[in-house]
């Protein structure tokens, strides 16, 4: 079940009883203002996460977009599935090529980004990866710019993405495109019994 509350009394009611009955906690994932009280409360019950990932939430409004020349960045196709899977280190069956935007240099996939969510108003970017041999060359910025331009042209008004706190190079490139840091997000993963 999902708990979104900053009210500690309500949190205790919603979490303590299910935990006492043996409910296994797998993950707490939410904006930090909701997730942190839950994670801290679970720690008081001696349920500690294996790992915590804190991310900044970056938001881009269409009117703030500072697009750049994207070179040959393009949407993915079925023919690209294997190279997308290789760069993303995922199984090919998990790749949805039409949600991917790709940048190739000399027939090598050097950067990619994809859509994690889409509504009439918003798009959420994820899976931004630049090949380790091609980092700090602007390829990630180009592929994200192409993706943003595509969805703004489709009528969406805002883009959203999550960036780990320690990924300073990515934060800089998103800010150059017009993204603003607007919130914090926390994911806490727990061991399965």
Stretches found by the model and what they are:
Residues 22-32, 151-163:
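Conserved GNAT acetyl-CoA-binding A-motif
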């Amino acid at each position: 079940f999902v708990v979104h509350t900053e009210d500690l009394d309500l949190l205790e009611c919603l979490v303590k009883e299910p935990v006492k009955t043996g409910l296994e906690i797998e993950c707490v994932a939410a904006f930090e203002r909701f997730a942190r009280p839950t994670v801290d409360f679970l720690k008081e019950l001696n349920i500690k996460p294996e790992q915590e990932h804190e991310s900044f939430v970056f938001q881009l409004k269409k009117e703030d977009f500072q697009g750049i020349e994207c070179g040959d960045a393009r949407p993915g196709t079925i023919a690209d599935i294997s190279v997308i899977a290789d760069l993303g280190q995922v199984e090919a069956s998990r790749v949805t090529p039409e949600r991917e935007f790709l940048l190739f240099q000399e027939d090598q996939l050097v950067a990619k980004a994809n859509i994690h969510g889409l509504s009439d108003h918003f798009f959420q970017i994820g899976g931004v990866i630049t090949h380790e041999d091609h980092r700090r060359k602007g390829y990630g910025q180009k592929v994200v710019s192409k993706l943003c331009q595509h969805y703004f042209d489709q009528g969406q008004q805002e883009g959203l993405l999550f960036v780990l706190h320690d990924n300073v190079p990515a934060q800089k490139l998103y800010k150059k495109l017009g993204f603003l840091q607007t919130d914090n997000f926390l994911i806490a993963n727990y061991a399965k019994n």
